[in-house]
Amino acid sequence: MTSSSSSCKMAVFSDIDGTLVHYPPAQVMQQDIDDNKNDLLYLPPSKTGQRGVISSKTLRLCQQLRNEGVPFVLVTGARSTTLFQRLPYLPRADAYVSESGGRIFYPNSSVNDMVDGMVDGVLVHPQPYEGCPSSDLEPFTLVEDLLWRNEISNLDCAGTDGYSILAPRAGSDGFSTLTPPTPIDQRSGKLWAHARNLQKKGFFLDSSGYATAFRINRKHQEDDIASTFDEFLEQCNNREAVPEELGCSTNLGCVDFYPKMSGKKNVCDYLIRKFFPCSNGNDESITLKSHAYCLCDDDNDVEMALACRTAYLPSVTSESMRRLASESKNVIVTETEERKESLATEAALEMILNDISKSNSI
């Protein structure tokens, strides 16, 4: 946290894609570029050619939260290498979570100091944005939460074989590995045993850049698997044939598998107690309910949204999230016909700031 001025102990957890970062149609983005709009930052193209944008105002509002002593955390299901590549364009945060909760990193501004857990090869140089204070441009390294890593890398979870040493390079993901990733068939741990079982059934698995999770994408499957993928999604939602030690979440035709102690809600539980160790004793659910806001948009955010005090949805990408918003007064959609994408994100952040301000004045 950049300040401890806030007397109201609150934290904000935010998803990234569809929440802070948006993907306008190519023609709209090109028009913005032609108009030389400097209130938007353009992220590097993804492997599929998509290019996200984040607004300068979004970045300023996130920094305002931190200036008021509110811990701000980015929580994504993306692989760690993807998160590392995008960090220069994202809000500075008090913690960064990748792989659906599997890995936690903290910023370290002492870039020349070697500390336990430092991520080799990652030095983040933040990109400037409109209204950016000079302090936001200071480079930083990342330090992994070794307590969390030690728990999640035991053999009942993900094991230790998925971790690789990284080195920066030019390229689509910005990183290469100094140690080649261990193939799935050589990885120990309950997670990878399940992965091998799914491979035997014909599923194509994506484990590149993941140490504590893997993804199954409908688009990557052979025709016979793709034709019955909806049934597979339903089975996963019902936890059919999912080992007790594992968790899973579905989103936009993908399924992520990870250790049961992982997942977005569980990592939020862990971090809120780390930020506020005395909050509400040891009652995890009350701690999040009383002290956390979240920003999110899709199916793999549902548990996190329900666990927090209030969830704000700048966009809604699934019917289940739309239904959740209609059924719960604590799930608020900020998107309207006139206010979409970055404008809806900015509105959500302003609502959180206003609520915190009211709480502080009581």
Where are these regions (language model features)?
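Active-site neighborhood of HAD-like aspartate-dependent phosphohydrolases
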Residues: 7-12, 16-74, 80-82
